[in-house]
């Protein structure tokens, strides 16, 4: 067990905020701070929210939500309210407020559920529905959960709906976003090839970029090779929302098939920074999953110790 000290947090913060470092290395420090948890780590993460990388800022917001700590509420509320911020970052901050589930975020979520930016308004609606659902229902136990992520909507009760019915609900553009998400996560939890193919159909859904981006994220969690071609088509589509292409790129990295490496390397030159940076992170993840010597992806402390050793040797 790692004792969280100011020295460790400051070292990770230094890497996180160092614009000269590769984006993938900065992400590793971010994930390490998320895993260590606590106010010191939240402050360190928040200190990088003025970075020019929208991808990094959005990932910080995501991590703050996954920590489920009310200490991060003010930072997240400010992000949602900032109309000059990138929509992807505002969306992630709103989703994080839903993940934390505090009543003090209700006012902001309700106010911005009519935001002119659709990704923001839909996420606020989704987050409100999540908070209201958990006010009336017991959360899943850790034993019941198949994935450790704090999801923006709970799956439906296991066995209560057939796979075909779930697919129908998931693809029904007339259904509200919360219930479509519930069907999405139910398909994820089934996790067989037919469910993965049903999810891949969602990448072609034109009713919601928010839904498509969540599909890509979930396909990364599932790591099923049958999703490689649909994800490849998605990330290559320059007309697609950058938020969706980003998730598709990182999903390909999570699947960690060496056949996707040339594609990801090519897209390092993509004109959309969110996509090119996502491909750099995806390649780092692919390398990790294909390197049996690696133990933990969020290895910021290991990197920090190695840096300190080098510094000492140079003195």
UniProtKB/Swiss-Prot annotation:
Cofactor: Fe(2+)
Pfam families the record matches: HEAT_2 (PF13646)
GO molecular function annotation: deoxyhypusine monooxygenase activity; iron ion binding; oxidoreductase activity
EC number of the protein: 1.14.99.29
Listed pathway(s): Protein modification; eIF5A hypusination
Transmembrane spans: none
Keyword line: Hypusine biosynthesis, Iron, Metal-binding, Monooxygenase, Oxidoreductase, Repeat
InterPro entries: ARM-like, ARM-type_fold, Deoxyhypusine_hydroxylase, PBS_lyase_HEAT
Binding site for Fe cation 2: 91-92, 213
Binding positions (Fe cation 1): 58, 246-247
Keyword field contains Iron: yes
Reaction catalyzed: [eIF5A protein]-deoxyhypusine + AH2 + O2 = [eIF5A protein]-hypusine + A + H2O
Source species, domain of life: Eukaryota
Protein task: Catalyzes the hydroxylation of the N(6)-(4-aminobutyl)-L-lysine intermediate produced by deoxyhypusine synthase/DHPS on a critical lysine of the eukaryotic translation initiation factor 5A/eIF-5A. This is the second step of the post-translational modification of that lysine into an unusual amino acid residue named hypusine. Hypusination is unique to mature eIF-5A factor and is essential for its function.
Family the entry assigns: Belongs to the deoxyhypusine hydroxylase family.
Protein's name in the database: Deoxyhypusine hydroxylase
């Amino acid at each position: 067990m790692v004792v969280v000290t100011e020295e460790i947090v400051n070292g990770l913060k230094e890497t996180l905020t160092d614009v000269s470092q590769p984006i993938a290395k900065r992400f590793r420090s971010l994930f390490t701070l998320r895993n260590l948890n606590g106010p010191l780590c939240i402050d360190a993460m928040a200190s990088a929210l003025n970075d020019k990388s929208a991808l990094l800022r959005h990932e910080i917001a995501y991590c703050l939500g996954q920590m489920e700590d009310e200490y991060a509420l003010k930072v997240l509320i400010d992000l949602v309210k900032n109309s000059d911020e990138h929509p992807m970052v505002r969306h992630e901050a709103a989703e994080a407020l839903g993940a934390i589930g505090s009543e003090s975020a209700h006012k902001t979520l309700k106010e911005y559920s009519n935001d002119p930016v659709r990704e923001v308004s839909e996420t606020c609606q989704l987050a409100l529905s999540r908070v209201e659902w958990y006010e009336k229902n017991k959360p899943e136990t850790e034993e019941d959960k198949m994935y450790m992520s704090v999801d923006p909507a709970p799956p439906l009760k296991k066995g209560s709906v057939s796979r075909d019915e779930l697919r129908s609900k998931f693809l029904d553009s007339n259904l509200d976003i919360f219930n479509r998400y519930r069907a999405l996560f139910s398909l994820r939890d089934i996790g067989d090839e037919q469910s993965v193919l049903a999810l891949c159909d969602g990448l072609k859904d034109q009713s919601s970029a928010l839904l498509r981006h969540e599909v890509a994220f979930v396909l990364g969690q599932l790591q099923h090779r049958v999703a490689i071609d649909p994800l490849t088509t998605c990330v290559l589509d320059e007309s697609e929302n950058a938020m969706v292409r980003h998730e598709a790129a990182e999903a390909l990295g999570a699947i960690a098939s060496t056949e996707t490496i040339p594609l990801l390397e090519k897209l390092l030159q993509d004109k959309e920074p969110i996509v090119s940076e996502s491909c750099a992170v995806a390649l780092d993840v692919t390398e990790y999953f294909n390197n049996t010597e690696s133990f933990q992806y969020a290895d910021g402390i290991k990197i920090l110790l190695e840096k300190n050793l080098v510094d000492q040797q140079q003195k």
